[in-house]
């Protein structure tokens, strides 16, 4: 039961005989007790929300169409946002629409989250219009969400037939409106974001952080994995971390095109740090009972928040540290390879000039150099000809001046994305060795069918 049951998916009859084994299982799996009557309700109503494959995406700013009647100022901030300024009129009227529709099936629910910023005198309404399947204009139903409702996740709960949904935004008033991203995710109707039990945190600027915590067997270490760059929203590394056998925490974000390297406002970064500490303390662990890890963009999160937590070890694959350099390399060394880096540079520093590159690099290295790493191991696999952050490994080594710090590294020939398989293979092998040597954990290989 411990191995085959997933967290948040264990349901026990409240009349079952209580013993030490069952109590431990319910605790470790975040299980729930139900009466016989509640079980019937669960099967009738809630079971459908435990579907296997989560899904989330966002509409990019370049899929937005501006209404012909708007004559104000229009500005595109890369792939980050569309900024409008002017007089939207005294009454609500359509200001923008999104060119791509999304499907929604009968009985399905979709969570919507609109990232935006606006002047106080500007008011908006998000409109979702569903058409009948197989038709171009046969109206089926319509949802509207005003300013107050948009403060929370909005849900399209479809109790009618299948059909595509078209989105538009109405506005009135005078001032500025920045449309950043419209996110749509398959909803579990309050039972978790992306995965059952998935936690969502949001700042006053509407920026999100996602965490999925599995207590495992509640024995050290807690394995924390930061998701890398991805355009499909959700968590990364679930099977990898679950196969380690112990408690694990997945961290993810959905800003920019595929992530913002976990950097943000003071509120954002404090929220993420406190979320990690909350799960550590829930287990009764200390920072020395924690391992941070990540691949590519996820390595920055592991290093950046590693400065705050100072875990027992940090396991990295394809490390990225000088994000200013990553953006600068887009011009000559990697043209068109990772344009999101330019959006990140502009978002964090307010520009894309050489001085902004240096400012972004300094943001990381000042924090890294101020940290005492004397109790932390670094296990790093890197690409020798990396075209994102060419000097990440060597620069990390040169900045690790704390007494007692241990570094294990392996270089693999190729550019950043040339041999991810070899990187992941060494990453997981060293992770398993770390668990065995330092925590006496043996990772059992999953059975093959």
Region spans (language model):
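Glycine-rich nucleophile elbow surrounding the catalytic serine of serine-hydrolase chemistry
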Residues: 294-306
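Beta-strand-enriched, solvent-exposed domains that form extended recognition/catalytic surfaces
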Residues: 53-195
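Hydrolase active-site cap/lid region
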Residues: 307-349
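Alpha/beta-hydrolase fold nucleophile elbow
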Residues: 284-296
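Alpha/beta-hydrolase active-site loop
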Residues: 262-285
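The feature captures the conserved acid-bearing segment of alpha/beta-hydrolase catalytic domains
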Residues: 334-410, 416-420, 424-446
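Short beta-strand element of the alpha/beta-hydrolase
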Residues: 219-228
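Conserved alpha/beta-hydrolase
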Residues: 245-258
């Amino acid at each position: 039961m411990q191995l085959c049951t997933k967290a948040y998916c264990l349901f026990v009859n409240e009349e079952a005989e209580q013993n030490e084994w069952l109590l431990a299982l319910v605790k470790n799996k975040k299980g729930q007790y139900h009466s016989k009557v509640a079980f019937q309700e669960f099967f009738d109503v809630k079971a459908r929300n435990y579907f296997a494959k989560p899904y989330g995406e966002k509409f990019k700013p370049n899929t937005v169409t501006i209404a012909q009647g708007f004559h104000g100022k229009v500005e595109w901030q890369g792939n980050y946002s569309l900024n409008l300024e002017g007089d939207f009129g005294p009454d609500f009227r359509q200001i923008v629409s999104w060119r791509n529709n999304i499907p929604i099936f009968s009985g399905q629910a979709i969570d919507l989250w609109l990232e935006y910023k606006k002047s106080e005198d500007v008011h908006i309404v998000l409109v979702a219009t569903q058409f009948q399947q197989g038709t171009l204009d046969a109206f089926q139903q319509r949802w509207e969400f005003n300013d107050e409702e948009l403060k929370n996740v909005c849900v399209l709960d479809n109790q009618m037939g299948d059909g595509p949904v078209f989105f538009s935004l109405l506005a009135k008033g005078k001032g500025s409106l920045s449309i950043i991203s419209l996110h749509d995710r398959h909803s579990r109707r309050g039972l978790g974001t992306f995965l059952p039990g998935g936690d969502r945190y949001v700042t006053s600027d509407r920026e999100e952080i996602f965490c999925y915590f599995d207590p495992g067997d509640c024995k050290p270490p807690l394995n924390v994995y930061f998701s890398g760059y991805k355009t499909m929203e959700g968590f990364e590394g679930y099977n990898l971390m679950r196969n380690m056998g112990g408690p694990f925490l997945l961290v993810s974000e959905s800003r920019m095109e595929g992530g913002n390297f976990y950097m943000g406002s003071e509120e954002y970064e404090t929220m993420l740090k406190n979320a990690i500490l909350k799960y550590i303390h829930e287990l009764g662990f200390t920072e020395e009972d924690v391992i941070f890890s990540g691949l590519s963009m996820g390595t920055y999160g592991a290093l950046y928040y590693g400065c705050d937590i100072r875990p027992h070890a940090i396991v990295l694959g394809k490390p990225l540290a000088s994000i200013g350099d990553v953006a600068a390399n887009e011009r000559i060394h990697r043209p068109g390879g990772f344009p999101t880096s330019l959006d990140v540079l502009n978002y964090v520093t307010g520009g894309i000039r050489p001085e902004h590159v240096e400012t972004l690099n300094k943001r990381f290295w000042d924090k890294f150099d101020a940290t005492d790493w004397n109790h932390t191991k670094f296990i790093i696999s890197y690409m020798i000809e990396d075209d994102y952050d060419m000097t990440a490994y060597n620069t990390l080594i040169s900045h690790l001046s704390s007494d007692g710090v241990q570094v294990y590294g392996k270089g693999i020939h190729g550019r950043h994305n040339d041999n991810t398989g070899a990187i992941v293979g060494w990453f997981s092998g060293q992770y398993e060795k770390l668990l065995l040597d330092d925590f006496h954990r043996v990772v059992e290989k999953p059975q093959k069918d």
